[in-house]
């Protein structure tokens, strides 16, 4: 299976820093800010069948509603090339509504049933289809 992992957490560039690519790697933000430009945003990994699109550079950490709508186009653009597209989004789930299914992952110490029910209800109201919640230690 071919998998495309998209780092859609626009508030933090965890994966970009982890792979020590510096601040020059183009990614999701570059596509959202200028969708008509032909960006080379897919990074091929050394794991067969796994490619990554990093966050890219977002100096203001703001993505407009129109730019979020462009994210749907990004998913559609690559959906025929990959068996699965996995998106890591920010805590607000700004991009989750454009995904077919959503899985919420929470740290055990940050988990409460009340907060989780609130988050699930909010995401469902935004049009997300929630598969479930994973609580990690």
Residue ranges with predicted function:
Residues 5-80:
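P-loop/Walker-type NTP enzyme "switch/lid" segment
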